[in-house]
């Protein structure tokens, strides 16, 4: 068995069955069943769902949506990712799988916005997300670091 890695989940009935494992252990606000069912019905081939398989079973998942700030009052301008419903099965929690999912999203090099759910503020703090408060509610934001050592064509001689 290879080292677990993050992969884009297929929108199909096998994934739907895998999602049912999460229903009993998480809060209703983390449920993705209805969201996945809607994508199956719409025959949407671009899956917003990502997960980690271990031993052939889905053990951790999240959804990522590409968004564009249309004037919302928060610290992101332009294109960003919205990370929703990150969840790891209880047996596999505190083993780095949630962090692995977040690091995958960070690797896409877009700012990330997420809402801390179910006592997860410490998790987001540990991963260098910054808390943001706006009238609509609180959330966390992460910005990619800019590489100060990068030389552009205009700067090179």
Swiss-Prot record:
<dbReference type="InterPro" id="IPR000182">
    <property type="entry name" value="GNAT_dom"/>
</dbReference>
<keyword id="KW-0012">Acyltransferase</keyword>
<dbReference type="InterPro" id="IPR017274">
    <property type="entry name" value="YlbP"/>
</dbReference>
<feature type="domain" description="N-acetyltransferase">
    <location>
        <begin position="9"/>
        <end position="146"/>
    </location>
</feature>
<dbReference type="InterPro" id="IPR016181">
    <property type="entry name" value="Acyl_CoA_acyltransferase"/>
</dbReference>
<dbReference type="Pfam" id="PF00583">
    <property type="entry name" value="Acetyltransf_1"/>
</dbReference>
<dbReference type="GO" id="GO:0016747">
    <property type="term" value="F:acyltransferase activity, transferring groups other than amino-acyl groups"/>
</dbReference>
<protein>
    <recommendedName>
        <fullName>Uncharacterized N-acetyltransferase BCE_3967</fullName>
        <ecNumber>2.3.1.-</ecNumber>
    </recommendedName>
</protein>
<keyword id="KW-0808">Transferase</keyword>
């Amino acid at each position: 068995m290879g080292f677990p890695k993050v992969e884009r989940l297929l929108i199909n009935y096998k994934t739907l069955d895998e999602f049912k494992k999460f229903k009993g252990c998480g809060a209703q606000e983390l449920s993705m069943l209805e969201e996945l069912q809607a994508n199956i019905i719409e025959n949407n081939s671009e899956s917003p769902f990502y997960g980690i398989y271990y031993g052939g079973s889905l053990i951790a998942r999240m959804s990522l949506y590409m968004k564009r700030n249309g004037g919302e009052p928060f610290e992101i301008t332009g294109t960003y990712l919205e990370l929703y419903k990150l969840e790891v099965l209880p047996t596999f929690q505190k083993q780095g799988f949630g962090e692995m999912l977040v690091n995958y999203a960070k690797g896409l090099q877009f700012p990330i916005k997420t809402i801390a759910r179910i006592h997860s503020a410490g998790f987001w703090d540990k991963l260098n997300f910054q808390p943001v408060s706006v009238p609509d509610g609180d959330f966390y934001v992460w910005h990619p670091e800019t590489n100060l050592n990068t030389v552009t064509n205009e700067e090179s001689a």
